[in-house]
Regions:
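Short linear motifs in intrinsically disordered
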Residues: 29-36, 89-91, 129, 249-250
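A short, structural micro-pattern
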Residues: 38, 57, 94, 195-197, ...
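Extreme N-terminal, non-catalytic leader segments
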Residues: 45-106
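Glycine-rich, often acidic-flanked micro-motifs
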Residues: 98, 102-112, 127-289
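Conserved lysine of the Walker
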Residues: 117
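Post-Walker A alpha-helix
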Residues: 120-121
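Aromatic pocket-lining residues of Rossmann-like dinucleotide-binding sites
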Residues: 124
Length: 289
C-alpha cells in the first residue's frame, strides 16, 4: 500500500485552535475521532490515545501516541482507521467491509458496526477459507476488472466470538485499552490470502431477523446507496474527491454482484451460513456470461 508511515515519540495532545470539520462518535455517543484541516494536510485526533497527521495527498502519515498510550494502540488505530482514510485521499475506493477468498474469487461482506463482518470472515477462515481483510475493504480496477486488495493479516473479534470460533489457538496481538476486542494474527488456524482477488460478490448484512440464511438481489440504485453509506472518506467536504468517489461507486454499483444477506445471529448457524454463501456465489459464477 502506498502510504509512508512513521511513528513519532509520545507527545501531549495540545489544544487545536481551529474547529474540527468532522467527527466520529462511538456507540455511546462519545467522540471517537476529531478531523482537523492543517496547512499541509489533516490532523486526526483520537482523544487520550494518539494524533495522526496525514499529508494532503494521503501518501505520508505521522503518528504521535498520547502520553501513556501503548504502541499497540497506535498501531491498531493506524491500520484500522487512519490507513483506509489516507488511501481514500489518494482516490482509492475504501469500504467498511470484510472479505474472503472463495475458489480464487473475492467475496465481501459490508454492513454497519455489529452486523458480523469480522465474525463471518473469521468463521470462513477457521473453516479453511482464506480471508483478505477484516475491515478496510480496498477495491481497485485492474484491466477492466475490479479486484480486492489484501489488507493487514489480522482479525478483530469480541471475546465471545473468539471463544466460539477460535479459542486460544491463535496468536494474539497485545491488548488494547479502548476495546475488549482481541486482534488475532493470521496463521495456520486463520489462513490469510496475500494476493489480490477478482471481486465476485458483495453481500450487505442485515439485522439478524431471518430464521434461515436469506439472500436477495439488490438493484444498482440500492447498491449505490449502500456503497456510499459504508465508504471511508477523509475529507467529506472536498468537492473534487467527492465527485471522484461518486463516479467510482456509481461505476461499481453497475456490476451485477450485490445481494442482501440476513441470517440468525447464532454461532451454531454459521456453518449453514457459510454453505449458503459458497453455494450462492458458485452458482452465480457458473451462470455468469
Amino acid at each position: 500500500m502506498t502510504v509512508n508511515y512513521l511513528e513519532q515519540p509520545a507527545r501531549p495532545q495540545a489544544p487545536v485552535r481551529e474547529a474540527a470539520f468532522h467527527q466520529w462518535t462511538s456507540h455511546n455517543d462519545a467522540v471517537w475521532t476529531f478531523f482537523y484541516r492543517q496547512q499541509t494536510g489533516y490532523l486526526l485526533r483520537f482523544p487520550d490515545m494518539a494524533d495522526f497527521e496525514v499529508s494532503a495527498d494521503g501518501r505520508r502519515v505521522r503518528g504521535w501516541p498520547a502520553h501513556g498510550a501503548a504502541s499497540s494502540t497506535v498501531d491498531h488505530l493506524y491500520l484500522n482507521q487512519v490507513l483506509p482514510l489516507a488511501l481514500s485521499r489518494q482516490g482509492k475506493l475504501m469500504l467498511h467491509g470484510s472479505a474472503v477468498d472463495i475458489h480464487g474469487h473475492g467475496v465481501a461482506f459490508i454492513g454497519e458496526s455489529g452486523r458480523g463482518k469480522s465474525t463471518l470472515a473469521a468463521s470462513f477462515a477457521t473453516g479453511g477459507t482464506r480471508f483478505l481483510t477484516d475491515d478496510g475493504l480496498h477495491l481497485e480496477w485492474v484491466g477492466g476488472e475490479c479486484q480486492i486488495i489484501p489488507s493487514h493479516p489480522s482479525i478483530r473479534l469480541w471475546e465471545d466470538s473468539q471463544e466460539a470460533l477460535i479459542g486460544n489457538t491463535a496468536a494474539v496481538a497485545p491488548a488494547l485499552v479502548f476495546t475488549t476486542k482481541s486482534r488475532l494474527l493470521a496463521g495456520p488456524g486463520i489462513p490469510f490470502c496475500d494476493q489480490a482477488r477478482p471481486l465476485r460478490r458483495i453481500y450487505f448484512l442485515g439485522e439478524g431477523e431471518a430464521s434461515v440464511p436469506t439472500i436477495e438481489r439488490l438493484r444498482p440504485a440500492e447498491a449505490l446507496i449502500c456503497l456510499a453509506r459504508n465508504s471511508f472518506l477523509l475529507d467529506i467536504e472536498a468537492r473534487d474527491m467527492l465527485a471522484q468517489h461518486f463516479d467510482d461507486v456509481s461505476r461499481l454499483a453497475q456490476l451485477p454482484i450485490y445481494f442482501s444477506l440476513d441470517y440468525p445471529r447464532s454461532y451454531d448457524h454459521l456453518p449453514q451460513v457459510r454453505e449458503a454463501i459458497i453455494r450462492h456465489a458458485c452458482e452465480q459464477e457458473r451462470h455468469a456470461p
